[in-house]
Curated annotation (Swiss-Prot):
Any Pfam family hit: BacA
Family: Belongs to the UppP family.
Additional free-text comment from the UniProt record: Bacitracin is thought to be involved in the inhibition of peptidoglycan synthesis by sequestering undecaprenyl diphosphate, thereby reducing the pool of lipid carrier available.
Top-level EC class as recorded in UniProt: hydrolase
Membrane topology category: Multi-pass membrane protein
Annotated transmembrane regions: 4-24, 54-74, 92-112, 123-143, 154-174, 194-214, 228-248, 255-275
PANTHER family documented for this protein: UNDECAPRENYL-DIPHOSPHATASE
GO cellular component, one term: plasma membrane
Keyword Transmembrane helix: yes
Organism for this UniProt entry: Baumannia cicadellinicola subsp. Homalodisca coagulata
Swiss-Prot/TrEMBL catalytic activity: di-trans,octa-cis-undecaprenyl diphosphate + H2O = di-trans,octa-cis-undecaprenyl phosphate + phosphate + H(+)
Full protein name: Undecaprenyl-diphosphatase
């Protein structure tokens, strides 16, 4: 029998995921808090929140496919929304992505169980505050004349350091995009370049986390869960695709201050709800 309420929850969480995945506000944090409000907080919740992120990642792969083809030494017709930033003699390649993945991959595997224990609303609120402080610091003290003005200028060391900042995002509520963009700005990368590099890092990072969660939680899942996962996945994909296409250039040039204020407001709202 189809669980109508479960499908509605999946639809809502898919919308939340698609809207927030690439903003520095933490999509995982939003989904945990919204899941709690909707009463969807059983053993399957944690893996569902990771699985539907694949929908957003598919949207990124489609929109950024030219860059991915170049990373693998291939070429494709030029039509991406940020195509003007792509140099077909690109100096960015897979080594940059691998270096950016190493720190968080190691810590994620070593402390998997401990990290999952933080998937609770109260910890999300703490992480939202900490992530806001990093966003604020990077906004105030970043280099006004960055050494890497476009994504192809990012060095191996900068890629690795951005990956180190990504480790903060292992805490739900911190924001993976917020951590990587802020980290990039603090190590001499322009906000535009850090934003694009954050997009590329998201694909293997979230895909790897999903595979690991599936492996760990497979016994908890059943065939009855498939419709809910499909609804969440498709919704997240479509909403993320629309959001990225509409707001790519706007988000890249924005100050972090509105996001910092939003995150603090979100903490206050959910604190009042949870007490």
């Amino acid at each position: 029998m189809v669980d109508i309420y479960g499908l509605v929850v999946a639809l809502i969480l898919g919308i939340v995921e698609g809207l927030t995945e690439f903003l520095p506000v933490s999509s995982t944090g939003h989904m945990i808090l919204v899941s709690y409000m909707l009463g969807f907080n059983n053993d399957k919740t944690k893996i569902f929140e990771v699985l539907i992120q694949l929908g957003s990642i598919l949207a990124v792969i489609i929109i950024c496919k030219q860059r991915w083809f170049l990373l693998f030494g291939l070429n494709l017709k030029k039509w991406e929304i940020y195509q003007h930033n792509i140099n077909h003699g690109s100096r960015l390649h897979l080594y940059h992505i691998i270096l950016g993945l190493i720190p968080s991959s190691i810590l994620g595997l070593m402390f998997y169980e401990q990290i999952k224990s933080f998937f609770e609303p109260k910890y999300v609120m703490y992480s939202l505050i900490l992530g806001s402080l990093l966003l604020l610091i990077s906004q105030l003290i970043h280099d006004k004349k960055p050494r890497a003005t476009c994504i192809d200028d990012i060095s191996y060391l900068q890629a690795f350091l951005i990956g180190c900042f990504q480790c903060f995002a292992l805490l739900p509520g911190f924001s993976r995009s917020g951590a990587t963009i802020s980290g990039g700005m603090l190590v001499g990368v322009s906000s535009d370049a850090a934003f694009e590099f954050s997009f590329l890092l998201a694909v293997p990072m979230i895909f790897g986390a999903t595979i690991l969660d599936l492996y760990r939680h497979l016994p908890v899942l059943s065939l009855d869960d498939i419709p809910m996962f499909i609804i969440g996945f498709i919704t997240a994909f479509l909403v993320a695709l629309i959001t990225i296409k509409l707001f790519w250039r706007i988000i890249k040039g924005m100050s972090f201050i509105p996001f910092v204020l939003y995150r603090f407001l979100l903490v206050i709202v959910f604190y009042l709800i949870l007490i």
